A protein has these predicted regions:
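Conserved small/polar residues in nucleotide/adenosyl-binding loops
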Residues: 225-231
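Early transmembrane alpha-helices of polytopic membrane proteins
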Residues: 200-223
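Short, Lys/Arg-rich, polar N-terminal cytosolic tail immediately upstream
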Residues: 2-20
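Divalent metal-coordination and catalytic microenvironments
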Residues: 28, 77, 181, 217
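Alpha-helical transmembrane segments of multi-pass membrane proteins
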Residues: 40-58, 130-134, 214-215
Length: 235
């Protein structure tokens, strides 16, 4: 009887294996590793776009691509590098180091941590797919200001939705960081005893929560103008 019980309960973790382990994981180290790998992949994609830009600017005149595609590469390079390479890299380091530095077993909201990561691949798949649209990808420059944002064809609403999803991911991650730092420090570790890396992320998280809704409002107005302005097709 006891042998049968031991056989049935020899593994108490019951964790999924294979790809499901990475899809469903709530371990802060696993999620941090996925953030870092995702950042590296986006860095290579953004780097290829930068190579196209630099090759075109190698000397005066048209070299490799038409001006419209050059503008698309400039816009996508900015979005990929900022939201796909730089920010996920720092979030990956935060997932790895913050719980260890403050003596916490994991992030305060592990499932939210998983969700905030898996938003990124879907958002960037949608964003990069606009390059294959008949009207081409967004060609609004780094700032997405009108009037350039009004001539992006059908790709602009998809790009704006992607930025909304990326902002949602950032807000969820910032909430998780704040909850972890304020509630899961080791006994005796006051705010003044925290490492500077943890302090940096605590301040950054508050700034993200304050700034991302402003960005969301700005790009929402751009989307509204793009969809409703009768003269949105500028030639």
């Amino acid at each position: 009887m006891s042998a049968n019980i031991d056989k049935l309960h020899d593994d108490h973790s019951h964790t999924p294996s294979g790809i499901m382990r990475w899809i469903t994981t709530t371990n802060h180290k696993d999620i941090g590793t996925m953030y870092l790998w995702f950042s590296l992949i986006m860095f290579f994609i953004g780097g290829l776009m930068a190579l196209v830009i630099r090759a075109e600017l190698f000397q005066p005149g048209l070299q490799l691509v038409v001006p419209g595609f050059f503008n698309q590469m400039t816009t996508m390079h900015a979005l990929v590098m900022i939201f796909g390479a730089v920010m996920p890299a720092f979030v990956g380091l935060a997932n790895w180091q913050i719980p260890i530095m403050i003596g916490a077993p994991d992030m305060a909201l592990p499932r939210l941590n998983n969700w905030s990561f898996w938003i990124l691949p879907f958002a960037f798949t949608m964003m990069l797919s606009t390059l294959f649209f008949e009207s081409g990808g967004p060609a609004a420059g780094w700032t997405l200001y009108p009037p350039l944002s009004l001539q992006g064809g059908d790709s602009m609403p998809f790009v704006i939705l992607s930025i909304h999803l990326l902002g949602l991911s950032s807000i969820l991650g910032a909430i998780n960081v704040i909850a972890t730092i304020l509630n899961m420090r080791a006994p005796g570790m006051t705010l003044m005893k925290m490492p500077i890396f943890v302090w940096t992320w605590l301040i950054t998280a508050f700034l993200l929560i304050a700034s991302m809704p402003v960005l969301a409002g700005a790009i929402t107005t751009v989307s509204y103008t793009h969809l409703t302005l009768p003269t949105k097709r500028i030639v």
